[in-house]
A protein has these predicted regions:
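RNA-binding accessory domains that recognize and position tRNA/RNA substrates
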Residues: 301
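Cationic, amphipathic, low-complexity alpha-helical segments enriched
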Residues: 304-305
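Anionic coordination/interaction segments
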Residues: 1-298, 308, 312
Length: 313
């Protein structure tokens, strides 16, 4: 999951920026989820704290942004731990990552670099020359980084983050208020990063977690580019929305039903674009376990694409 945990350091109570995984009582926890064109926004109100997280992939980029704004709506100063959590696979082959544990756990390692948790697959190959492989293998790098606030603590081991007999709804790393600053070697990897936000009454602060699979040097540059977090994220979302609204503007219908108009003009068209781009792969994040890319399905999606984007080659 793309989990963000919020912990009140005064009361030691904690919750998540989406209702799950913590799952607070809905009589006290209020939440909304909005799906837009290429982004999702989740808003939550609990214990005098309002949070809004926007998940998206910037236009023409290959990493995720989890843009979080937190507002103190109470009448007293609040100290909050904010923890972002991403669970990495060990083997990029989804099936092998599940069943071939004696191999998939053997090849994984996590370390902390500057403001991010770096996961390396086949880390022992990091000394070979760029572009070269051994047994068709090279180092694979994944990361979760933090922009807009300093890192207070981190964890790269799923078992250590969750704790024995704990689940994603009550991880020890969040309950304790401090991650253990330990990486992982030959176990199950994760990337967890905690920062502490001090908020005066009425104050809002904005941060971003960045997640991707890219070499370490480039990952560092990506995180550094979000120093002015709010301005960068707002601009990226404006570009993303403008692009998709432009794509969807070429073919529009107008009927007496607003719901039908929305379905045809936005969601049917957007879904056809997505399934065309991904070609009906089994998931948006991997292409294993099913039957890969479907030529027939892609041709079916073209029935709308050639109307909505007539200049597409």
């Amino acid at each position: 999951g793309r989990y963000i945990y919020i912990r009140d350091n005064g009361s030691k109570d904690y919750w998540s920026a989406s209702w799950q995984p913590v799952g607070k009582d809905l009589n006290e926890y209020k939440s909304e989820c909005h799906h837009g064109t290429a982004y999702t926004k989740m808003m939550a109100d609990y214990s005098g704290i309002h949070s809004e997280v926007r998940y998206y992939v910037p236009l023409n980029k290959t990493y995720e942004v989890w843009n979080l704004s937190v507002t103190n709506n109470s009448d007293k100063a609040r100290s909050l731990n904010i923890t972002g959590y991403a669970e990495f696979t060990n083997n990029s082959n989804y099936e092998q990552d599940q069943v071939n544990l004696q191999y998939s756990q053997y090849i994984t390692k996590t370390v902390f670099v500057e403001n991010r948790v770096r996961q390396m697959i086949h880390a022992n190959l990091d000394r070979i020359e760029d572009g070269k492989e051994i047994d068709n293998k090279d180092v694979v790098n994944r990361f979760i980084g933090l922009a807009g606030a300093p890192v207070d603590s981190w964890c790269g081991d799923r078992g250590e983050f969750l704790g024995e007999y704990h689940r994603y709804g009550n991880p020890v790393g969040v309950e304790s208020g401090k991650l253990n600053n330990h990486g992982n070697y030959n176990e199950n990897s994760c990337g967890a990063i905690t920062t502490v936000l001090e908020l005066a009454p009425g104050e809002t602060k904005t941060i971003a977690f960045l997640v991707g699979m890219i070499d370490n040097e480039t990952a560092g540059k990506i995180v550094a580019s979000y120093t002015d977090t709010k301005a960068v994220c707002d601009k990226e979302l404006e570009e993303l929305i403008a692009y998709w609204h432009g794509q969807l503007s070429h073919f529009q219908i107008n009927t007496p039903s607003d719901e039908f108009n929305t379905m045809i003009n936005t969601w049917n068209a957007y879904n056809c674009f997505m399934t065309f781009i991904w070609s009906r792969a089994a998931s948006f994040t991997y292409c294993g376990l099913r039957n890969g890319y479907g030529y027939r399905d892609t041709v079916q999606d073209l029935s709308l694409i050639h109307i909505s984007e007539p200049t597409r080659p």
